[in-house]
A protein has these predicted regions:
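A generic structural motif
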Residues: 23, 158-159, 213
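A generic secondary-structure signal for well-formed alpha-helical elements
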Residues: 76, 83, 111-115, 155, ...
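N-terminal Rossmann-like or analogous alpha/beta NTP/dinucleotide-binding catalytic cores
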Residues: 2-148, 297, 301
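Short helix-capping/linker segments at secondary-structure and domain boundaries
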Residues: 113-117, 152-159, 259-267, 297
Length: 339
């Protein structure tokens, strides 16, 4: 560790932060506004561990794992392009730190199955992803693997979307149960819900790679326009002359994220009086999205020219993550009598 990095670490005193993303496809506006912008700010004040959750990708995509390696490389490029700094944050791949799996296994010995079955996303994703067989332990147990991901680094805070809060609460319960059986090893982390955590997709549902409703960070200006100009709006506006209400319009949620107060006021007035159509309403929002993505995409192109950059970042991140993970697992094995 360099002197500059050590000084930086010492100045970031607000506790350890842990979060990850599954490499199941291109990152999109939901990731950017729901996680990545927040991560970039958090790395200034906290010791951050951000990981590519490739084992988590197998919980739903176990039958077709071929894209994980390339998706991992693309994800690291996106992270660097939006501003994550590998000299400040630990960026690593989950499967390269096997202690994640070991801690998950040990947790599985003490956690009741009903605790996993009651996690809301367990039923929700089964309903949303009906074309896949999700009757596996891996899918049932992925919130417990998340608990291992978090507790392995003794995180104080976990930045999540609102729908992931039950996973953090499960992690707190796991920590309490382990500590009750074996002594005080793990802290109880808190979930951080960030503003704009739930970004709507083009169909009005939460933006998700799985739903096919996402605007990718790598989409060029034409692709962004094509996708967002067709985004669903207030269903009452069947005709151009029908008035609507922005509070019932999924597209307006992107206005709230991207547009100025004056722009939102003008759009709101035009919608409620039917003085503008939905396509005209979306134009200013689309332009704002395009303007934000352009410099990110330029930085990404520059990074792509640096041969081996993703491998270098992941190798250094693995080294730093493994050092912490090994220390924690030494404590866990000792507490459980497994030394």
């Amino acid at each position: 560790m360099s002197n500059n990095q050590q000084t930086s670490d010492e100045s970031r005193s607000s506790g350890i932060v842990v979060s990850g993303t599954r490499p199941t496809g291109a990152l999109h506006l939901g990731h950017l506004n729901g996680a990545l912008k927040n991560w970039v700010q958090l790395q200034k004040t906290a010791r951050c561990f951000f990981f590519v959750a490739d084992w988590h990708a197998l919980t739903t995509d176990y039958a077709e794992p071929g894209g994980i390696a390339e998706n991992t490389r693309a994800m690291i490029l996106d992270w660097l392009a939006v501003g994550l700094d590998p000299d400040v944050s630990v960026l690593f791949r989950q499967s390269q730190v096997p202690e994640h799996a070991e801690l998950h296994l040990l947790f599985s010995m003490i956690i009741p199955v009903p605790w996993l079955e009651r996690v809301p996303s367990y039923k929700e994703q089964q309903d949303q992803l009906q074309g896949r067989d999700l009757s596996t332990y891996g899918f049932l147990g992925y919130p417990l693997l998340q608990s291992a991901d978090i507790l392995l680094y003794k995180a104080a805070r976990v930045p999540v979307g609102e729908d992931q809060l039950p996973h953090v609460e499960l992690t707190r319960e796991v920590a309490r149960r382990f500590n009750r059986f074996y002594g005080p090893v793990f802290p109880e982390p808190t979930g951080m819900v960030v503003e704009a955590a739930r970004v709507p997709g083009t169909d009005g549902r939460k933006m998700s790679k799985s739903y096919g409703n996402a605007v990718a960070l790598t989409d060029d200006a034409d692709a962004v326009h094509t996708k967002l100009v067709r985004m669903v709006t207030d269903p009452r506006r069947q005709r151009r002359s029908d008035p609507g209400d922005p509070k019932d319009c999924p597209a307006f949620r992107l206005h709230e994220i991207y547009c100025t107060e004056q722009e939102r006021a003008e759009v709101t007035q035009g919608c409620r009086t039917a003085s503008i159509g939905c396509v005209d309403c979306k134009k200013v929002m689309i332009r704002r999205v395009q303007d934000e993505l352009a410099p990110i995409q330029e930085r990404r192109r520059e990074l792509t020219l640096r041969r081996g950059i993703t491998e270098e970042v992941l190798a250094e991140g693995r080294k730093q993550a493994a050092a912490v993970a090994e220390t924690t697992m030494g404590e866990v094995r000792g507490a459980m009598g497994l030394l």
